[in-house]
Amino acid sequence: MARKTYLTLFLLLSISFMLKAQTMDGGLTNSSLSQSQPFLYTMNGLNPAAQHWSLNYSGGYGQYTVTPLGFDGVDQNIGVKGYLGNRFTILTNIGIGFGRGNTQTYQQAEVFKDFIGGKNPTGFRFGTSLGVIREFSNDIVILSRFNAAYENLAWKFAANARLEKAFATGRDGYDMISSFGILRRINGQLFGGVEAVGQDLEGLWETDEAEGGAKVLIGPSLNFVPISSRLSFSLNAGPILYVTHSTISPYDSAVRELPLNNGFTVKFNVGFNFL
């Protein structure tokens, strides 16, 4: 009799625990944690709540800007981001830009791997990536980045340190691009914060920086994930500040023309989890 009582209590406790776990997992799956990329410039591998495949449509408008901060004119991009297993994530993008009387295209493929964390929907994770880009200027660029993120139901933090090697004349031997983003829950599934990107920051101490000098983009960000929806929305806008100007003329290079004036860019992303 006592054995049956203990067995019954054990079964009831087990069922209660499983139901509670399912409720928590379902809540996280349908939360802001399930989106593929809350930020516009700062990318990371997928957390367990977002380990699916998503289609991302992004676009923007910019003036006096360069890749990867934006595009001079109007650009539109279609991307796919998906989970490959064992904490590997793949990101692909194709884009088209209209500006300066020309039509230009852009392609990207990148694979991410989380080495620390990445086993729980919330908390800290850290990893790296390797990829290749064909820029709007037709330059071929190989990139690798260290990426870190921290997420919970109220906060989102992300940071990238991205190293690029462009195979084109008139470009730096290597470029370092740093970015970070912070989002705080405002109400429900609506988040607000800021995202910043620094490019060619070696121009702060090198007067002969090959690509015109240091550039910084910083601006407010919004992110929204409707409850029990496969959609997510992100928006960022801000000025592009040319903090320093190199003694090398930007127009010495026939490959691409670099702006001399401060600029601005507006960028959005609409994500859809299709698998």
Regions found by a protein language model. Name each.
Residues 17-21:
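Sec/Tat signal peptide C-region and signal peptidase I cleavage site
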Residues 7-8, 117:
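General helical structural elements
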Residues 8-16:
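Bacterial N-terminal signal peptides
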Residues 1-7:
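Bacterial N-terminal signal peptides that target proteins for export
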Residues 178:
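Anionic-ligand binding region
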Residues 22-144, 149-168, 175, 183, ...:
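Transmembrane beta-barrel domains of Gram-negative outer membranes and organellar outer membranes
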